[in-house]
Amino acid sequence: MKKIRKGDSVVLLTGRDKGKQGTVTAVLENKLVIEGVNIYKKSVKPNPAAGVTGGMIDKTMPVHISNVAVVDGNGKPSRVGIKLVDGKKQRFLKTTGATLSA
């Protein structure tokens, strides 16, 4: 069971965007794509056949999963634990003990 999932609210712990909060939009193997965080400018070549105009675009790049933490109800970073409830695994926040949605 993955500890961080799509839709979780997270905060960056390191890097140039340290302290910024966002929502996970995609989970890759060991990386997360977070909305509005780690945005880089990429150059795109024009492709008239596909209807793409060239130029600079803003692209959200992935962040390693070790550099983020889930945000608890108080807005503070928290680690995520897994416990068994009625024979099923349930994610919970270690700071408050609150359970996270499935």
UniProtKB/Swiss-Prot annotation:
Example of a GO MF term: rRNA binding
**SUPFAM superfamilies assigned:** Translation proteins SH3-like domain
UniProt keyword terms in alphabetical order: Ribonucleoprotein, Ribosomal protein, RNA-binding, rRNA-binding
A Pfam family annotated for this chain is KOW
Name of the gene encoding the protein in the UniProt record:
rplX
Specify the protein name.
Large ribosomal subunit protein uL24
HAMAP family tied to this protein: Ribosomal_uL24_B
Q: Which GO terms describe its biological process?
A: translation
Gene Ontology cellular component terms for the protein in this record: ribonucleoprotein complex; ribosome
Task: Recite the lineage of the species.
Answer: Bacteria, Pseudomonadati, Pseudomonadota, Betaproteobacteria, Burkholderiales
Q: Which NCBIfam families match?
A: rplX_bact
Which family is it part of?
Answer: Belongs to the universal ribosomal protein uL24 family.
Organism from which the protein derives: Polynucleobacter asymbioticus (strain DSM 18221 / CIP 109841 / QLW-P1DMWA-1)
Subunit-level organization? Part of the 50S ribosomal subunit.
Which domain of life does the protein's organism represent? Bacteria
What is the role of the protein in this entry?
A: One of two assembly initiator proteins, it binds directly to the 5'-end of the 23S rRNA, where it nucleates assembly of the 50S subunit. One of the proteins that surrounds the polypeptide exit tunnel on the outside of the subunit.
